[in-house]
Swiss-Prot record:
One of its GO terms (cellular component) is proton-transporting ATP synthase complex. Gene3D superfamilies: N-terminal domain of the delta subunit of the F1F0-ATP synthase. F(1)F(0) ATP synthase produces ATP from ADP in the presence of a proton or sodium gradient. F-type ATPases consist of two structural domains, F(1) containing the extramembraneous catalytic core and F(0) containing the membrane proton channel, linked together by a central stalk and a peripheral stalk. During catalysis, ATP synthesis in the catalytic domain of F(1) is coupled via a rotary mechanism of the central stalk subunits to proton translocation. This is ATP synthase subunit delta. The keyword Nucleus does not apply. It comes from the Bacteria. Belongs to the ATPase delta chain family. Keywords: ATP synthesis, Cell inner membrane, Cell membrane, CF(1), Hydrogen ion transport, Ion transport, Membrane, Transport. It is found in: Cell inner membrane. Signal peptide: none annotated. It is a peripheral membrane protein. F-type ATPases have 2 components, F(1) - the catalytic core - and F(0) - the membrane proton channel. F(1) has five subunits: alpha(3), beta(3), gamma(1), delta(1), epsilon(1). F(0) has three main subunits: a(1), b(2) and c(10-14). The alpha and beta chains form an alternating ring which encloses part of the gamma chain. F(1) is attached to F(0) by a central stalk formed by the gamma and epsilon chains, while a peripheral stalk is formed by the delta and b chains.
Amino acid sequence: MAELTTLARPYAKAAFEHAQAHQQLANWSAMLGLAAAVSEDGTMQRLLKAPQLTSAEKAAAFIEVCGDKFDAQAQNFIHVAAENDRLLLLPEISALFDLYKAEQEKSVDVEVTSAFALNQEQQDKLAKVLSARLGQEVRLHASEDASLIGGVVIRAGDLVIDGSVRGKIAKLAEALKS
């Protein structure tokens, strides 16, 4: 995974710098998201791995599948990635691009998993507290997992806050073992 990120980083950085310079961050994020989804398709992966096809043929097929969703610069990006055999890295490129975009916008995606559904008021309060703690705008994504028994698990980038009953029971069990 780290190797893929290392290979994807220059492409994500170049795409981000281009999109930022032309004030097209949202468009490029959408285009790279589509490209990532297309590259993850099983049929497309077989085509991209086919040794008998040239990089130009792979790029043309890729662009054909995406239709008119790509502007000229995005098509050029696909050609460059194909020439360097990096089309299969598009999911990592897209993820890194979105990370750079979030950093630039001073925002962070936060995944909140709770034992029970959070109402809008609870989500708003949680987002406000997390925003103050993280110093960034928070985009909250809530989900439910009954196996937590109670409480919440919050994930924001590398930060994980486990306030679930299941997590506390696991810590207690670990303490009793030692």
